Amino acid sequence: MYIPESIGTPLTPNATKVMLLGSGELGKEVAIAFQRLGLEVHAVDRYEHAPAHQVAHFSYVIDMTDAAQVRELVERVRPDFVIPEIEALATDELVKIEEEGLATIVPTARAAKLTMNREGIRKLAAEELGLPTSNYEFCSTFEEFSAAAEKLGYPNVVKPVMSSSGKGQSVLRSSDDLQAAWDYAMSGARVANSRVIVEAFVEFDYEITLLTVRSIDPTTSKPATWFCEPIGHRQEDGDYVESWQPMEMTPRALENARSVAARITNALGGRGVFGVELFVSGDDVYFSEVSPRPHDTGLVTLATQRFSEFELHAKAILGLPVDVTLISPGASAVIYGGIESEGVSYTGLAEALAVAETDLRIFAKPEAFTKRRMGVAVSTAEDVAAARDRATLAAAAIKVHPGNSAEA
């Protein structure tokens, strides 16, 4: 993977350029991290005024699943690095772009292609690497889906193979749920006529995200892996609501988690941050999913670590030394839109920031939806429990109002 010998000046012919494919709240923080290191940032999304658009040097609106549009933009900009920040991309074209040497795909084009859907990454994890996972079946039709659910037993979980943030995901408790779950999975998929994965229910004690960083070890000049402290999180309908770090684990469970994370990220290759999602039952660890990019539950690292997951991602991509030191226990709590409106306004910032050791990130998305993440509160404290209370209190103080209805 390419390592620049120097960093050029933005907006000049010798600029070192990064192109973000996906410009949401995570991409916004990545863009800021790269700008702090002196790189020229090009942010791409499917709609105007996305969060990262607002902080990048250049912004573009294209259909990122359209191979021709992706290629035209890469050939026009000629970025040094193309950094996927979402799954729904023309990954076959990224493979060609990488093979032709037009740009370095982060972490690799193969990783982007494998992780764009649950089928590719699950087969790599379970069938090629032999990692422990739940029992599962992939299905293309309702008939296959119904048979798989009966085979795996109830309760089980169904997800589209291509979706994000819990869209289309549901728990089946009996055969009475089959039709509704199938219809919901089809509506939540990113592509029409999507396949689904049906997973046997895993009885787990808790779930974690283990942020795994691949960069160059400055002492050996060779690729190496670092692990952030484990992040616990709570989900509702498949979407994260709050996260905290560190998540208390037994030494054996942590060792097993790091082993699973190292094996899957080594198989994907390249450099950067990987969000490895794991189920933990006692000392046993089960692989769930992996994202070859910063993870939404990792927003907590804005408060807890010396360098956030976004700063670590930027440094690792460039092959620079990384520092995963935890400086304080902390937590994050999501601020949802709660309404359907464009050009919303926010109140309650003073009340939220009056909570001790607390900060906010308002994502500045141009349109709010009831369950759309519009911001996050991050807090630190002497322990995780106190930090969770603080973050939840601060997030609840923020109110989202339609249009310009809020008073200044």
Swiss-Prot record:
Mg(2+) binds at residues 277, 289. GO terms for cellular component: cytosol. Keywords: ATP-binding, Ligase, Magnesium, Metal-binding, Nucleotide-binding, Purine biosynthesis. The keyword Magnesium applies. It catalyses: N(1)-(5-phospho-beta-D-ribosyl)glycinamide + formate + ATP = N(2)-formyl-N(1)-(5-phospho-beta-D-ribosyl)glycinamide + ADP + phosphate + H(+). N(1)-(5-phospho-beta-D-ribosyl)glycinamide binds at residues 25-26, 85, 296, 365, 372-373. PROSITE patterns: ATP_GRASP. It is an enzyme of class 6 (ligase). Residues 123-318 form the ATP-grasp domain. ATP binds at residues 118, 159, 164-169, 199-202, 207. Pathway: Purine metabolism; IMP biosynthesis via de novo pathway; N(2)-formyl-N(1)-(5-phospho-D-ribosyl)glycinamide from N(1)-(5-phospho-D-ribosyl)glycinamide (formate route): step 1/1. GO terms for molecular function: ATP binding; magnesium ion binding; phosphoribosylglycinamide formyltransferase 2 activity; phosphoribosylglycinamide formyltransferase activity. GO terms for biological process: 'de novo' IMP biosynthetic process. Its EC number is 6.3.1.21. Pfam families: ATP-grasp, PurT_C, RS_preATP-grasp-like. InterPro entries: ATP-grasp, ATP-grasp_carboxylate-amine, ATP_grasp_subdomain_1, PreATP-grasp_dom_sf, PurT, PurT/PurK_preATP-grasp, PurT_C, Rudment_hybrid_motif. SUPFAM superfamilies: Glutathione synthetase ATP-binding domain-like, PreATP-grasp domain, Rudiment single hybrid motif. Involved in the de novo purine biosynthesis. Catalyzes the transfer of formate to 5-phospho-ribosyl-glycinamide (GAR), producing 5-phospho-ribosyl-N-formylglycinamide (FGAR). Formate is provided by PurU via hydrolysis of 10-formyl-tetrahydrofolate. Homodimer. Belongs to the PurK/PurT family. NCBIfam families: PRK09288.1, purT. This is Formate-dependent phosphoribosylglycinamide formyltransferase. It comes from Corynebacterium glutamicum (strain ATCC 13032 / DSM 20300 / JCM 1318 / BCRC 11384 / CCUG 27702 / LMG 3730 / NBRC 12168 / NCIMB 10025 / NRRL B-2784 / 534).
